[in-house]
A protein has these predicted regions:
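Residue(s) in the substrate-gating loop at a strand-loop-helix junction
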Residues: 158
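Short, small/polar-rich loop/turn modules that mediate ligand/substrate recognition or access, typified
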Residues: 190, 195, 267-269
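Substrate-binding pocket helix/loop in short-chain dehydrogenase/reductase
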Residues: 113-115, 119-127, 230
């Protein structure tokens, strides 16, 4: 397997890659960079038709030209009214009336604020993007999956979804909630042929990962006092990982693709850590 050299690099698949997605349709949120981009690239390589959703414009140069015909980009702020439904309808209009796979990747970090310092705007924004949007996306795709008694949902959560010592309160709560939503959907629709799992990446080479390393949350400055309380945990993980390569977005995407295949037919409702043993600390 050829690994991308950066979060926004072009993925060139080997000639022998398994076309497990032939004839299937996938939706990927947050497709413009990092894990979302890697998922879109890898799913296309596996012959899925992919509808990518992102708030930023998409750079088609990051896809192989041969894959452009199986990729539809829909630009949207998914926190807007009916934006999730419109995104799903864009996929259905582009590729027919089926949705085989939903990958909820889109997320924001926030500023690491603790409970005594989090602002209403930070809380509302982080929870909206990281939890409300994935739930609304699941709500929108499940009727299409129920029609054919088949479908897979993979939610990209985080090690922060099982720990209180990794991120700020808004991000931590949003990812805990997403894991809970994953389990609820898995149990509720287990008899209808729908599987729902979560992957829990640790520190990865992505836009959010680079923001943490630089000491800011992308669009928001970190709460330095609150971040100081979780920084030792990040430092411990970084120290333990010095002898191994960074986790790449492609490696997370490979786990997503595995969970989407029939090889994972009996795997439902799991939270799969992808973190080089960070979750055991």
């Amino acid at each position: 397997m050829f690994f991308t050299t950066s979060p926004d690099a072009l993925f060139i698949p080997p000639a022998t890659i398994d076309p497990v997605g032939f004839g299937k349709v996938a939706i990927v949120t947050g497709c413009g960079s990092g894990v979302g981009l890697a998922c879109a690239q890898l799913l296309l390589a596996h012959q899925y038709s992919v509808c990518g959703l992102d708030a930023r414009e998409f750079n088609y140069a990051l896809l192989q030209e041969a894959d452009h015909g199986r990729f539809h980009f829909h630009r949207a702020d998914l926190t807007g009214p009916r934006a999730c439904e419109d995104g799903v309808y864009a996929a259905v209009a582009s590729f027919g009336g089926r949705i085989d796979l939903l990958v909820n990747v889109a997320g924001v970090m926030g500023s690491f604020s603790s409970a005594d310092g989090v602002t209403d705007s930070e809380w509302d924004r982080v929870v909206a993007v990281n939890l409300t949007v994935p739930v609304k996306m699941m709500r929108a795709v499940i009727p299409f999956m129920l029609e054919k008694k088949s479908g897979v949902i993979v939610n990209v959560a985080s090690t922060a979804g099982v720990s209180g010592a990794v991120a700020g309160i808004a991000y931590t709560c949003s990812k805990h909630g997403l894991i809970g939503a994953t389990k609820n959907v898995a149990w509720r629709f287990r008899k209808e042929g729908i599987r729902c799992n979560a992957v829990l990446p640790g520190a990865i080479d992505s836009r959010i990962g680079k923001a943490i390393a630089a000491g800011h949350g992308g669009d928001e400055e970190f709460d330095a006092e609150a971040y100081a309380q979780v920084e030792p945990v990040h430092a411990l993980h970084a120290q333990a990982s010095e002898s191994t390569p960074d986790i790449t977005p492609l490696e997370v995407a490979q786990s997503v693709v595995f969970l989407a295949t029939d090889q994972a037919r009996t795997i439902n409702g799991v939270s799969l850590p992808i973190d080089q043993a960070w979750n055991v600390v």
